[in-house]
Structures are given as structure tokens and as C-alpha cells.
Amino acid sequence: MKSPKKYLKFLLFKPLQLPFALCVRLIHFFTQQHQKLNRHQFLKVLFLATLVICLLFGQVVSAQTQNASLLVEQGIKDYDAGNFPNAVKHWQEALNQYKNNPSDAAVVNENLARVYQQLGQNKEAIESLSAAIRDYGAVGNIQQVGRMQSELAQVYSNLGQPRKAIALLCGKLVDKSKSSENQPSQEIKCTPESAEQIATKYNDKRGQVAALGILGEAYRLIGSYDQAIKYLDTAQQVSPESKFLVFNSLGNAYKSRGQLRELQADSANKAGIFSKEKEFTKKSQEDYDRAYQYFQDSIKFARNEKQPLAEMRGLLNLIQLGSQTNQSKFINDGEFNTTIKDALEVLEELPDSATKVYGAIDLAYLQHDAKGTSPFTYCPTGLVLSGDNEALNLLENSVLTSKKLQDNRLISFSNGALGHFWECSPDNEKALKNEKALKYTQAAIIAADSKLSAKDSLYLWEWQAGRILDKQNRQEEAIASYQRAFDTLEDIRQDILTAERDVQFDFRDVVRPLYRTLAQSRLDLLGVGAIADEGRAKELSKVVNTIDALKLAELQNYFGNDCILSGLNPKQVGELLEDNSVAFKNTGFLSSIILDGKTGILLQLPNQATKFKWIEDPNQQGDKVVSSDTLQKKIAEFRTGLVKREEINYDTTIASQLYDWIIRPFAEDIKPEKVKTLVFIQDGFLRSIPMAALYDSKLNKYLVETYAVATTPSLRLNTPKLRDRSTQKALILGLTKEATIDGKTFEQLFAVPDEVSAVESIFPNHTPLIDDNFLAESFQQTLDKTTYPIVHIASHAQFGIIPEDTFIVTGKNQKLTISQLENSLRNLNSKSDSVELLTLTACETAVGDDRATLGLAGVALQVGVKTAIASLWSVTDQSTSELVKTFYTNYRNTGMSIAEALQTAQIRMIHAKKLPPSEGVNPMYDHPAYWAPMVAIGNWL
């Protein structure tokens, strides 16, 4: 083989030294950070959280076969000049000549992978890297196989698929559910064929640092911050080279962990565990201190090694840490302003690159007291660069730079950012600015859609276009744009939402408003009569599908993995109602939807058109629509009155008012002779109340006296079916003792012994695990041995605002986390082994906390059971035992549905004062505080 005149040495770990080897910052979904209450940055810091190795492992490489060497050499020149399309053309031609030469084909595929990444063509990059791995393996170059696996892992990680990255880098994933604050994650030895082990075996220090660095970053992206820090610490010990990259990633890892601990402190505060709040707050501040120091060190080392791109990343990370609320103490005003000045100076000197484009956008949208979410989802205020068109100039320059680079991904982000600037400009010359905003936004859409170069941002620009069109009073075009944004987001949502929940983008600021905007826009068109009568049903069906998708996304976001959607029915809600019209013939479905300032109710009945009504108060002066704030206050007041149960004779005033607002408008449609069961699919704060306790003042009846009542997060998640109840084996778990978990005392449940005895008497074939015998380990071992269709848990179950604070109290002051419960139940061997019914009789959810009740609503689906019977709040009284006993008797011995079995049990307690003493039911149990909190979730048949 004849070497080309210019042979470019393979450079493993210094990709920043030459222009053509600059790292492409592939924007992905999980590099965002959060502030309190899941405040994650989404596309705000467009490249700050740079992977530890920008693993274009250096430079494009020359192949050395005589006939193709000139093509390879020409491709290198094209690449070096930034003419990436021509580089692809020449290298593809060379590759065709290397079909029977795997050694040189591997080199060309390696080069193609890098240029495809420059062009934002990730699918092609993955194919080329996979081919390079195959070819290097064929010729026995195992060290290079390891390096290519690391590079492929980085691409997957950048695309929001860090678990695939971990599989390539190590082969095994640390199980977070088997670790805790006091029990660190187990040590994992990577498999022999993994990138990390290949590098170790061949003493490839640079390859080892690369694998460890990307591995650490991947663990950061799935929320395993302790594991991330461990790998990154190891990376800096293996080799002293390019510490600025490792330090930058360590800074991001500590910052992410600090934000998680800040979130946990807030959750502890809401749960009343103030000692834990103090502990998490202290740890959070310590992590922020470390992040600050690592960013400083990263900047210092980058300057010493004359690496302006790395210096830029460090500066912007430091600026963002300083601009976030509650972080200002780390950087005083003087240092903050100096750092911005330094960043602007470095930006000016950078060569044209992705870093220069994203850096300009970040600086342009830099805010004082940043919200921590994407600046493209709202109009930012308090821009730091607010004078002399500084921000505008940066954005316009970013557009010019992206065009020079011919990178559709960069073109998309730069035009989208500039379009958003004009969208948010003051109202003077409004028409002209809207035209400019739309022009640049449409350019962003075209670029993002070109070979799916930036599909992860396409929905942002479609959404942005919809908002601009709305301003121009082009409502139908706006809705079409919102719909395209929705469709794109639905397509990529699985990747966005399947990381651990604490590392996802800010769901509340990104997904939720888009879905609600689309639904409200369609309803507004219906309200003004813009849709003909024959089209109303179709439009309402679209609204239903949009809101259903939102509720699915909320659940996936809360639990942070894709298991909850494993049984998702691909059909839309209307199709499911039609397919199951016989099973659902006596069932009405009421879906609530909270929109801008008002709340609506959708009624669906099999084989009938969907109906919609805003919640209204006929006694209200002027506009009859009840504001969402008013409704939320009324809901909180209703629940508080139930939980406190201060009065022996319950005052039904609020319950009656809510009935009149929510149920009565549909009275003619849900007459009891036609509808026997009402299934509620609730939104937001409406999840926190038991609908069974609403009161019909005209009939002097609670809702549950007329209808069986159930709730489900979505019909698509667990389409109800009649189940075989012939197998009556029960696993009964209970805790009778007082327990202390994380500084919070859970009082003794005096009624649990009676409750357990009652369940044992109904299910003779049972296994009890009580008090110290009820532990996570014994629970798992028992399930491994025997199938139990029924699992009854009589212990405190706390549902927090994050899954980490969702657990069941077990013996020995320990807890069974929702993740452990899920793993235990999902590890059952087959569908025939699955749990049909999970009962939790002492659940606690925070008042007014819709995220906690979201956890309760999704628990059955999350842990893989068909139905959950659970309480909205704990009732420390014999009433639970009475209710459960009647429910199980009905469930086992009659042909009642699950909802009807619960209904009958609740009606029995409502009539407690009328029952003879021989029944043994305390007359005070007629108060809804005792029977209303138990709800049926999931399959109600």
C-alpha cells in the first residue's frame, strides 16, 4: 500500500487541537439540569454539559490502498476545509473499492462516522461505526474495536440513549434499586468484550480514559450521580492528559447531584421531615461547591493547555451555575461579570465550529436568576446581554456561522433561536417582528427536518411557529403547527422520558404546555363556532387523544422509565371504546382537563359522541366559568374537611357544590338505568380527591350510592378485561409497630392485626409476612417461590413528589421502595404469574400535591399489576378492616366487578347507622372520611 502524502496520525484524546477535529455538540434530551421541583434545563445550555471525551477520537485517518488512497486524501482535504458533503462523497467512493479489504474499510468507515456526525446524520454515523467495529474485529485489531465502541457509545449517549452507551462501554448497568444512601451501588466489573475492559487489557490509557469518561457521563445522564462521579474520578487517575475535560464533566455531575438533593430537600419539607430537609440542603450546597471548583479547575487547565473550546465550555458552565436561582452565592457580581466578559472574548477568537454557534446562543439567552428551563418555551426576561443589540448580534452571527459549516443541526438551532428572539421582542412594530420571527422559525424547521438532522428540536420550532401564527390570528394554521409539534414529540417522547426521572428535561415547562395549548386551541375553535357540527365529534376526539397522551407522558415522566408503557395499546381512546362497547356498555368515562384559567370535563360513552363542558357555577355573577384557582381551592377545602373528620355529622355543602359543577351537567347522559359505573381519568389537583364522596343534594345520596366509581390514568395503559378469579391465593404483608424512616415517625397501626385476620379468614390459602418478617428481601424471596394473584399490604405507604420518596414501610425500620416493589412484581416468570390485585390500605399523599397523587394513580401500572385498591390518605381505625373485609368477600364470592365490590363495601359503611349492632360496624363510619379514601385504580371489571 502506498501512503498518502499527508498521513494524519490517529489522535485519541486531544480532539480540540485541529479545526477539522472539533467536537460536534449533539444536543440531546438529558443534559439538562433541574432546580427545585424537577426544574430541569431543556435546551437552555446547548452544549455546557459536554461529554468527557468529545469522542471524535481525534482526527480523520488516512487509508493506504493505492487505488483508493487519493480518494481518501481528497476526503481529508474536504473535511479539513469544512466541506463535509464532498468528504462523504470521496470516502464513499473509496469504501466501494475497499469491499474486500476490511483493514482499510475500517479506517474509511471511521472517517465517515465522524463526518456524518458533523452533518448531524446520526443514523449513518452509527452504521459507519458499527461497520468499523466489524472490520477491525475481522483483522484482529481489538484495541481499535474498543475505541470504536467508545465512540459509538458517545453517539448513543448524545442521542439520549445512555443505557446503550453503558452496554457498549461496560456491558452491565448498576441497578439503582439495589442501592441507597447507606448502601452504595455494588461494584460492577465490566465484561471482557466491553470498551473499558479492552482498553485495560491492552494498556490503552487514552482509550481507558475515554471509556471511563463517557461511562461516567452516561451514568450522569440516567441519574446515577454517585456512579458517574466514581467513574470520572477513576478516569482522571488513569491519565493526567486533558484533565480539563474530566473536570468539566465532574463539575456537571456534582451540579446534577446537587440539584437532585435540592429536589429531595423540597420533597422532605413537603412530607414534614425537616431533619432530612436540612441534611439534603447541606449536601446540596456541598455538591454545588464542588461543581464550582471543578469548573474553575477545568477553565484553568484549558487555558494552560491553550484549549479555547474547552475553556469556553467551562466558562459557560460557571456562568450558568452563577445565574441560577439560589446559586448566586458561588459567584459574586464582580466575578460573574468578569466571567461573562471572558466568555465573550474567547467566543470571538473561536474558529467556526459547533461550539461557537451554541456558545453564542447560550450567551444571548443568558438571564439573571434563570428558570433552569428551555428559553425557547417562554419569553426570557432579565437578559444579561441587554444593551446595544448584543444578544441580537450574537444570534445573527450564529446563523452566519452555521451556514458556513453547512450543518443542518446548527442551522436549525441558530435560526430557531433568532426566530424566538423576534417572537419575544416588544410589541412596537409587531407585524414586522412577527414576520421576521416566522421567517427564521420556518428556516429552523426546514433544517431540522432535513434528514432528521435535529428531530429532537423540530417540535420546538413547530410549537414556536404555532405561537407566532396565533399572534397573527391564523388559528387554523397555528393548530396545524401545534399538531405537527405534538406528533414529533410523541414520536421521540420514549427517548426523552425513559431516563431516570430526575435527569429529564423540565416536563412542566416543555411537554405539558404544548399538549395543553393544542387541546385548548381546538376547544377554542369549537367555542367560537369555527367548526361545523358534523366536525365537532372529530375535533373532540383529537382533544381526547391529546390529553390522553399528556397523561401518559406525565406518568412516564414521574416514574422515569418505560416499563409503565410496556403494555400500551396502540389504538386511540375512541377505538378502544368502540372495540369494548359490550364490556363497557354500562360505563361512562369522565376526563378532566385543566387549561389556562379554567377546567373542562369530557364525557365518553360507548357508541356515542363525546361531550364537553367547562366547569361552571350557575350562581356566579357574570361569566359562569369557574376559574381553575377557585376550583383548586374548593378541591383542597373538600379534601381537608374529609381528612380532619372534625364533625360527627358530615357537612355536605362543598361535596354538593362540586357535584353540581362536575357531575350534574351530564345528568341526562348518565342516567342510572343506563350507566352503572363511572370511571374518572383525572388531571392535576383533581386526582387528590375521592369522587365517590361527591354529594347529590337533590337525591340526598353520595355519588357512590348511585354509581360504582373507579379511576384510571389512561384506558390505553391497561384496557380492562374480566379476569379469572378462581385462584384465591393471597400474600399478606403488614406492620403493626411504630417505625422511623429518614427521621419521620410512622405511628403504630393498631387496626392492622384485625385487618390481617380478616383477610386471612377470607383467603385460607395465604402467606403472611408481618412486622420483622416483612422485609424487602423476604418479600422478594416469597414471590420467587409461589404465585400470588392477590397481594395485600397493611402498612404505611408514602407517595412523595419524586419516586425516591415513594415507599412502603416494612419491619425493622426499613422501607420497600417503589423501584424494589416494581422489580419484585415484574420479575414474575409469566403472565399467568402476574398479580391481579394489589391492595394498599394505609397510603399517604401530600395535600394539594398533584405529583404525589400521580404516583398513587400510576402505582398499579408501574409495578405491573392489573388493579390497585389504595387509599388517598391513611385511616388509623378499624374502619379499614371493615371495608376491606366486605370488599374481598364481594370480590371472591359474587359476580360483581371490582368497582361494584368496592361500591357495595362503601355503601354498607354509609348506612352504618342503620345496621344492627350484630353487624359490628361502628355508626360513625358513615362519615366519608372512613370509606371515601379507598379508590380502585386500573382494571375495574
Regions of interest found by a model, annotated:
Residues 1-39:
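N-terminal secretory signal peptides that target proteins for export/translocation
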Residues 170, 176-179, 183, 225-227, ...:
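Alpha-helical solenoid repeat scaffolds used for protein-protein interaction
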